[in-house]
Structure formats: structure tokens, C-alpha cells
């Protein structure tokens, strides 16, 4: 036997060899590739007649492909021959054949992923950026259940750089109709990548996916660009330019200033302020379109002669500038308190000595106050002023969120407080230096007055070596002061909770609300009765640290015998009951039935295909749900590869948007939003907790929603009653998305979802028209981009 080589070419990280085989023995040809003792991926594709194409990765090593003719038994296998694969030879011949043998090249290049072979393809659908690597995700076309054991990643030198046994959908009951979704982490900076799968006998399946160096870099860059949020947007300055006040608009604002508008006291503590920073700061106040202000300059370093001279120069030119000179530095809190005592304004604005303002910030604040004179506190969106004078890293903030402000001082700038409200709180002492503004926000929030957010970039926070904007380690004491500020706030309110630093992140705080051990939770779990799914669910619950809970499964009577038998064999200390109904599976109705059977104080509605990520998950959820002002608390759900499924839900245009979907759960995302406890528009239905009394007050779930938007409708009903809807990432779960909560086929699922969506839009049209107060309207109106916290750019039309 022999193998005849008829031609070579390459493309897309693969090498293609056209060969002729003697098939007279009627046996099936197979190819096996190796480099030394290392087995490598390879594919043998039939072209026509006795001609085949050997497909191998474009590795920078000498590969050897053996071709065997297989019979029914192992002893019937016949060695047909081998070919040596030298990548450098293919580089030369591919160029020549591309010109001289075009028809041959067109016939064999990409043969393994085109035509009828497309159905057997191994694809890579994209990459998700993560720290020091990428998550590659794709599909293996319709393998038999359990036949694929592992996906392996190689670099261009045939070195194994990643292995994964993670398949995202291998638990689906209708798996046979599906492609197998894989996920594997690979390193950055590779000069090429090959992804291949091996079966449970250790053999490579035929198809594999390759990227040459250029293609891999392109995929890497594309993934970072695709997932880049607004804070990383390289075109942000273009966006800012199109949203800043124009000269014409400034002129109009100056002519519209109402008589009797509030006086703003802009308080600036100065400490060794660089002269250029001072000029920028003071000029930005002088350029305000709203004229009714005073600038209080508290100079704690009068020995800085040049700075003192510059201060006096500015004060002599405008009577609205007032200087308070101290004998020495009292610390940021003490210096600020002196400025407050000197202020005579209706509102106190706290302005850092090295930052700058947009010219319309006071006008926008005055306009908001004119519309609502009872506003106690105002803040706006902001960005960073880089050392080179450019602007970057915009912070688009939500409206006031009490849970988020306990997590971190996202309010930040330009913090402006009604003087009358300030006089009702106790001034902070030096122990809160570095967190004095945060403490003030928390104290003002306790008054119960109005807190207003102006969703415009009106403040520029300068990045410098001594500012926390550029170096969070520049004020190491500030995080400890922040912990104290939040703890004192909770203590004043009589809320039993412990505050600590959140996962070692600067200026981030974790609040653990204490849970009464007598509080009982009922886990209400609608199920289709898949025993493998239920077994995994129970195993996931066994590590739960909080012990006072029960499970209420809800199922159709057609599967009840299997569920009851499974429950009887469960080794759990907690009670498990089964609510059985003859009714067709309707998620909302099944949840209502389970709630009626539940004995707990707090209902935790869960899908049966979730797995808690931390032992404290339930105690964390109960801590939030037990708060009287909270109506419902939801969690982060993740895919098995630790990419985020959702980190809270928003509403954009006409769609419910799963926030941060597809991003790496270990990355900060947009300004740590996915990792931040905060109030949200709605919680996801995979797992959420609510007090039973609140559930009954709302009137249970609306059974008009069959399988979709049940938790969204419930969240909106709670918000209408004045309850908070809270999201916490500290109680995250894996969501396998195996169980289908619809009685329809695949086409029917879409129709049912559309019907449920129409019901949601109809029922809540007035509320939905107001948008999502917890999601900044500067983000994109395209749901997919909004999910990634991206902004839209106005594309300029050019004429040729």
C-alpha cells in the first residue's frame, strides 16, 4: 500500500494535503497525526473517488501523519503509508499553487468547514476577555451524548496551553438535537492557536479550529473591543465633545438665570495646591453660566507664598471669591468644616482643589432645585482628567441607591448639600478623614429628603500621584474611614450589621446584615422532574451554612412518583415536601402553589438547575430580604465557565436587559458594577428571595406570565408599593439553564416569550415609559450594548 501526495496549500492556520489512496480492499481510511510521542489533531476528508484531503494544524514542528485502512476488527487494520508535514514547505508551495493550481487550492482549502462538512464542524464563536487570558467558546457539531471527553488548546509550536472538560449544555434533556457548547481558557500573546476535542477513548475527533498568529491577535483585539465598556472607550472624548455645552447654549443659559435662584457656596480646601491646578479649578468656577455663587477658598498652607499670592490675585478680581486663611492644616475634614462655617449660601458645594467643573453644572443644579425646592443633595456624572489634559473613564451613575451608597461612595462629585439639611446633621470629625464626603451623604440620606442626580458629565476628577483618582493607595486610611462611616450610619439607624472591606478592594465595603437564627426560609422549586438535575441541585445545597430552611418542590402529577421517590432517598437534615398538581407547567402558577405550601418566613424562589457558589449564599440573601424596606433580593447568576449570565436586570428601549451578560465574573466590569450591591430595576427569576408577608401583600405572582418575566413583573409591583429591589453579587449561583419552563417546542418558546413580553409592556406601559432610574440613560439604547455598559457614538456622514 502507498499514499500519493498530489498537492499542498494552507489557510486559516491549517495545512491541506491532497492525497490518493488505494481503496481496492474496501476498507475505511483514517488518519493519525503525531509529533514525536505527542498525538496531534488531524482530519481526513473525502474529496472524490480515491482522492482525500489530509487536514492538519499549521504547527511550527515536523508532523507525521499515518494513514490506516480500518476493517471491522483491529487485526484487519492495514497501514497504507505516511506523509511528513513540514510547515515551511507548505508556505512556499501554497504561494506557488495559489497562482499555478488555483482550482486545486480552491477545492481543498477549507474543505473541512464547508459544504456537507459544515455539519461536522468544530467552531469557535468568540472569546471573552479575562485576567491574563481569554475564554474561548464554541460548538462541536452534534456528537453523541458523552462521547466528547475534553477540549485541548495548542500554541503554534504544538505545546498544550489549555485543557477543559467543561461543556455548558451536556445536561439538556433534548441534547441529541444540539451542538455541544464548550468553554476553555487560553493564554494571551500566543502566535497561533489550535482547539481540538478528544473522545472518551482518547482519540481526536475529526474537526478542529485553528487561528494563525494574525487571526488570533485579531480575535483577541476584537474580543477586548467588543466587551470594552464606557470606561475603556477610546472614543470617549468624541462622545464628550458632542454632549458638552456649546457657546450658543451657554449664551442662552446666561440669559435664562431666574431671579431669586439659590446661592451656591463652593467650598474648596487648599493644601499645597499646584499653581496650575489652582488656576484650572478657579477658572472653571468663574466660567459658570449661573452667576449666583460664592467661592470659599480655605487655605491651610499660607506659607506657600506663590500659592497665597495667586489666591489673593483671584480674590481681588471677583468679589464672589472669599478667602479663609488658616494658621495650619486641620486635615481635610477640619478644613472643610471651617469653609462650611464661612459659607452663606443656600447650598454647599464640596469641590476638590485640583479638579474642574463644566460651565453649566451650577445652572443644571439650579434648574433641578427650581423644579423641586425640597432637594437635600445633588450629584452628577463625572470623568477623569488625565495628566496630559485629556478626558477618560467616564462614571455614568445611577439615581440614588441606598444599597449602592453603602457599598461605595459612588455619589462622589459634585457633592452639593442644602445648607438647612446640613445643619440637621452632626459634622464629621478627623476620624473620618478620607471618607468625610461619604459620611455626609449617608447622614443626609437618613433625613429622608430628596436626593437628585443630574445624569450629565459635569465634573472632571484630576488624576495625579496624590489623588485617589489616580492612586487608590495614596490615602490608605480612607478605606478604613469609609468602613467606619458606613458602620456608624447603620448603627444610627439601629440596623444590626457588620461592615468590612469588600474583597480587598479600595473604598469598597461589604455589609453583612445579621440574620435571626429563628428565621426560616422556604426554597420553592418548580421542577420538570429530571432526577439527574434534582440530584445536582440537592448536592449543591449541602454546603449551605445557614440551616433553618426547607424545600418545596412543585411538579406535575405525571412525574410526581419519580420526584417523591427521589425525595425519600435524600440525605438532608432539612424537610423536603412535594406539591403535586395536574395542571400543565406554568412557572408563575407552580411558584404560587409552592408558596402556599411553604412554612417559611422568607420565600426563596429557585430554578432546579442552579448551584450555589458560596456556603453563605442563603444567609446573605436572607439578610437583605429581612430588611423591612426591601421587597425582593436577587443574585448574580453565572455560566459554568464563570462568565456572567446576569448581574441584575434593566429595561432599555423595549427590552429587559441582563446586565454584564457574557463578561468574566472575576473582572471588575464597568466600575465594579457587576460586583456591587445595589438597587436595580428587576431581579432575575433563577433565584430571588422575598418575605412571605410581602408576597401576600402583592397578591402572589401574576399567572398571566407563563414562563418569562415573572420576576420582572413582581419587581415592578414591589417598586410600585415603595419597596426596594436589591441585587447582591455576594450570593451568586451557577445557572446551568437546563430546565425548560415552557410547554412549547423550540419555535413555540419564542412565541410564548413574545406573548409574555407583550403582556409586560401592556401592563406596565406607564412605568416602563419612565425608564430605569438605576441605569444611566447615557448608555446605549441598543440592548446588547447596554448590557455591556457601552455608549452610542454619532457617526459622521462624509460626502465624496
What are these regions (language model features)?
Residues 282-292, 539-548:
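Short, acidic, metal-binding catalytic loop of nucleotide-sugar glycosyltransferases
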Residues 326-343, 581-598:
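Glycine-rich, basic loop-to-helix element that forms the pyrophosphate-binding segment
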